[in-house]
Amino acid sequence: MNAITTLNGTTATFTVRGDIDFDTLPPLRAAADALPAHVTDLRWDLNHTCFMDIAGLHLLFAPTPPGHAYRRITVTGLRPQPLRLLRLAAETNPATFPLDRLLCDVRAPL
């Protein structure tokens, strides 16, 4: 897995290439935590991510760490398996996994 970070004003986009699992979660989380303080929007581009396990849920729905400002998190380019996982999580526990605030380009009905 590798990730490319693009900064555009107050938005950071992480383009992830490869799976998101417990092996790849720590470096992704560290990269997000290291973003400059002026970044208020964090977008995960998952066009090249075919598989995501529960670690992806931890990455996308983690609470804001103490001492960090709130960042709006969105995801784009969801492939079928990660989208299926997110939908299942939202169906099981919509209060914990509010899918509507995360998705920015999925046109299929939720």
Regions flagged by a language model, labelled:
Residues 1-110:
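STAS-like cytosolic regulatory interaction modules
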